[in-house]
Amino acid sequence: MSLNSATFAIAQLNPVIGDLVGNCDRILDAVNKLATQGVHLVVTPELSICGYPPRDLLMNQQFVRDMDIAIVNLAQKLPPKIAVIVGTASANPLANQTGGKPLFNSAALLQDGEVKHIFHKRLLPTYDVFDEDRYFAVGTGSQVFTLHLQDGENLRVGVTICEDIWNDEKFWEKRNYADDPVAELTQNHQLDLLVNLSASPYAVGKQKLREAMLRHSAIVHNLPLIYANQVGANDDLIFDGRSMAFNRQGEIIARGKSFAEDLLIVRFDKGGAVPATSDHESNDAEIFAALVLGVRDYVQKCRFRQVVIGLSGGIDSALVAAIAAEAIGKDNVLGVLMPSPYSSEHSITDALALAHNLGIKTHTIPIQPMMSAFDQSLATLFADRSSDVTEENLQSRIRGSLLMAISNKFGHLLISTGNKSEVSVGYCTLYGDMNGGLAAIADVPKTRVFSICEWLNRTNSPLEIKQGSTEVIPVNIITKPPSAELKPDQLDQDSLPPYDILDDILDQLIHQHRSATEIIASGHEQAVVERVVRLVKIAEFKRRQAAPGLKITDRAFGSGWRMPIASKVTS
């Protein structure tokens, strides 16, 4: 038996952070299913025992000891003969003597009831959402094992973990590390197969980069490659799965599902590449699928059953309601209308039409009585001052309080509806519309919100919310000018540049890291750019207090955004 007649598998799993028993059960169930198909080696994602990222759970010494126990127990339960590689954290035995971090980010080879080998991650990402140097020591020791096949033949397998494969000097113009673990492996060992355990978060456009990089690695090193990626959402991070296997020519011969668990059988004797067709018709479709997974997993893993959303009749709350209904079912979504004297009639009818299209429940609470109560309570103190944004924000805070009351009373998760454009410049109210336990579209620019809603109406994708209806988002919600409706005849463009201009400036500032001078040079008006840059800086205190936002771009206002609040920067 040789590589071409051996059978491999990828268990693309959705772990729950910290659920060692549940995660081991998922692995065991997957391996038991694969055992019936003659599999010799199963590869799972990075840190599959505890889920990625475990963050400061790794500082809990008992949690780490429990991981060791869980791996031993799992090894004893696995079917005999099948080799399984799982991701785990393991102790650094030299930490006390020589210093350094107490743990390694590791991969454990389990077979015949035992933990046969432990391999350690060499490259520890500490940028954007990654903070592995906080917990882990740089890996040392062998990254190779011999897979003994039933006919007496052996295969030499090299084991890498996520970032280890992201530093090829022949692929990247600029590298983050001096070392290339894959190059060192292939130079020092005669390998038959390379595997990579990964927990690579989703971002728009990232899959093309992954495929190109992994294809390059397979071709350059003349090695078949198995890449096992985590799927599921953990807090702000969404993992898209899309595990792959490449032959030594760089052709993809197995491809995992996106945004769903999957078990892939990998046979290197089965000919050429699998079709390269995408399972999503556009970026809008892909982002929607990512957000649906993000909401579903956040709700379920936080042990909620239902959600509540404020329905304004605007496009942001419409999209969030659609995402929620698709994620957890229409019967588990409550939309609350809270009209004020400034709410237009079409906003109310649009919100109700949306709810009808989605099939979600609604409840209406006019806020005029509460507005009057606040006005009376503050009348003496505010007597010599004219109305301004204070009164506008009070309306938002009344609505936020009502939604939180409903959340508390019924145990529903409140999902806030602010988009990235608004969150960037602070066009949102702290303790008002920012209230919530999850910000579903906080990384989605306003222009993208429009395009996703337009896609929802025209797509033929088999979505639950499309059953029996061609129109998901009422057309008037998409076509009417955006407005917060906090004062008479108010439009967003009274306070902000047009969204196509604003989003381009924000893209250059946040994603391309350009200065105001460079953005102005690209063709935008100086006054507009300088105002937007200032708004982004002074809104930092709001973002610091916002609900966790699902990340779908390469630069989000979440765990990877670390800007000071009290600062003075002129550049």
Question: What does each of the following model-derived ranges do?
Answer:
Residues G18, E153-L155, N222-L223, R248, ...:
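ATP/NTP-dependent adenylation/nucleotidyl-transfer catalytic domains that generate, transfer
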Residues M1-G310, I323-K330, L337, T362:
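Enzyme catalytic cores with a strong preference for nitrogen-chemistry domains
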